[in-house]
């Protein structure tokens, strides 16, 4: 056992200083700095990847810098270094936003402006039109900052608790924070008022939703939209079928009504014909009295002649 302990102790790197320093090294790990062949061109032409704390060019502040864009120092106007009171710099100095009026050449404050008068892509103000409407008519030519809506995703509860199984594939945002070493060791005496670092929030697994990878939410939303469209199409088809059935029933009803009207008209015409025939005999009876009946009997042989008094004159008389 003693030999094993000695071996474990010797396996630690020299100058580690114990587990606490190892944890500090892991949490404060910095990526190596890479230099490419085109890095000087980017720094010289676009002032790219230059340190933000580099000194200010005094020659440019006085009005003329012979190096111009090749100068390794910062070229800032006097408005970026405004002072207030006893020489204290404004909170808006180099860490503030670029003046939106200066971008258009319309800033009236000049050197007294509390915003930056320099073209710095990292300090550009946010485009209000893009924030309100989700798009900007100026497109890529807009001078203001267009923030991707995906960057406003809610924080990942699994990552805040300490670990997210999906890693960079998670559809929620992962905010990197410096952990409190005391809390990581097991106890922080300052509690919620700790200023040494973040305290990961612990939430029970049953109270947390399952993490989803990027694109899964869009697929679920697409499936729901497809189901809604299918239901809508089915409803439209049922509505068309019901409308056709109603139209067919209405046509059949109209046909039956037409047939009924036709039968009624034929029946009325037959009744009118019968009434007309019966009405002729009645007229003869009324006009000729009782002799009409006898004449009717003798009409079969000779018929009647004339409309005189005596009635009929046939062959039998």
Swiss-Prot record:
InterPro entries associated with the record: CPSF4/Yth1 (IPR045348), Znf_CCCH (IPR000571), Znf_CCCH_sf (IPR036855)
What are the Basic residues biased-composition ranges? Answer: 302-317
Q: Which chain regions cross the lipid bilayer? A: none
Task: Point to the regions of Low complexity compositional bias.
Answer: 223-237
Which SUPFAM superfamilies has this protein been placed in?
A: CCCH zinc finger
Look up keyword Metal-binding and say if it applies.
yes
* GO molecular function term, any single one: zinc ion binding
From the UniProt entry, list the residue stretches annotated as the region Disordered: 1-20, 202-317
List UniProt keywords, sorted A-Z: Metal-binding, mRNA processing, Nucleus, Repeat, RNA-binding, Zinc, Zinc-finger
Cellular component GO terms, alphabetical: nucleus
Q: What is its main location?
A: nucleus
Comp. bias (Basic and acidic residues): 202-217, 253-288
Could you say which residue ranges form the zinc fingers (C3H1-type)?
51-78, 93-120, 121-149, 150-177, 179-202
* GO terms (BP aspect): mRNA processing
Q: Where is it located?
A: Nucleus
Q: Where is the composition biased (Gly residues)?
A: 289-301
Query: So what family is this one in?
Result: Belongs to the CPSF4/YTH1 family.
What name goes with this protein?
mRNA 3'-end-processing protein yth-1
List the lineage, top down: Eukaryota, Fungi, Dikarya, Ascomycota, Pezizomycotina
Its gene name is yth-1
């Amino acid at each position: 056992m003693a030999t094993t302990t000695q071996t474990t102790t010797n396996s630690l790197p020299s100058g580690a200083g114990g587990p606490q320093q190892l944890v500090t090294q892991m949490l404060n790990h910095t990526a190596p700095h890479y230099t490419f062949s085109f890095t000087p061109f980017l720094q010289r032409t676009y002032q790219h990847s230059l340190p933000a704390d580099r000194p200010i060019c005094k020659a440019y502040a006085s009005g003329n810098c012979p190096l111009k864009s090749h100068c390794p120092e910062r070229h800032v106007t006097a408005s970026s270094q405004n002072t207030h009171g006893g020489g204290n710099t404004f909170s808006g100095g180099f860490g503030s936003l670029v003046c939106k009026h200066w971008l258009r050449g319309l800033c009236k404050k000049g050197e007294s402006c509390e915003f930056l008068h320099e073209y710095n892509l990292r300090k550009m103000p946010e485009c209000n039109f893009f924030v309100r409407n989700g798009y900007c008519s100026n497109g890529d030519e807009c001078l203001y900052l267009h923030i991707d809506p995906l960057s406003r995703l809610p924080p990942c509860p699994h990552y805040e608790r300490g670990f997210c199984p999906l890693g960079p594939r998670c559809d929620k945002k992962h905010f990197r924070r410096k952990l409190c070493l005391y809390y990581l060791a097991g106890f922080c005496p300052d509690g919620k008022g700790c200023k040494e670092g973040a305290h990961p929030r612990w939430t029970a697994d049953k109270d947390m939703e399952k993490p989803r990878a990027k694109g899964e939410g869009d697929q679920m939303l697409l499936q729901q939209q497809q189901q809604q469209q299918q239901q809508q199409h089915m409803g439209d088809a049922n509505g068309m079928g019901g409308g056709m059935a109603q139209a067919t029933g209405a046509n059949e009803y109209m046909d039956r009504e037409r047939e009924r009207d036709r039968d009624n008209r034929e029946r009325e015409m037959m009744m009118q014909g019968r009434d007309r025939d019966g009405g002729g005999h009645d007229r003869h009876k009324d006009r000729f009295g009782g002799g009409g009946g006898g004449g009717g009997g003798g009409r079969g042989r000779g018929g009647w002649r004339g409309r005189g008094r005596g009635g009929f004159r046939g062959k039998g008389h």
